[in-house]
Amino acid sequence: MLATLDPYGWPHPALVSYAEILALDAARLRLGLHAGSRPSRHLRESGRATLVFADGELCCYVKVEGLALPGAPSAPGLARFELVVHDVLEDRAEGEEAGARLASGLTIDWRGDPAAVAGRLAWLRAALRE
């Protein structure tokens, strides 16, 4: 999940998939969003966001500063950002909450022909590498 700030200071959550995020190294990520989306507009305006990664026992909040990149020639509708990791907060169930686990979560179901879906995801990953 990606949380950006709208112009009024309210958090705006958005779902992102693994295909839209590419780790460049330990401190930099590349993010691809639909160019006309609210999250891309918010990130361009504020330059800050928080990525949330959660599994059964751990939740990580990755605070990032984002810089808009030029569009990829192969993906004109894609807004690309380079994200620099500013801080990482880890959250585990401890104390009275010890043993509590996230039992289920958000799952993206890529519908359609599997070959077409794989091609689309590969295209997106390639555009992030440009």
Report the location of each language-model feature.
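Binding-site signature for planar aromatic cofactors or substrates
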Residues: 1-130
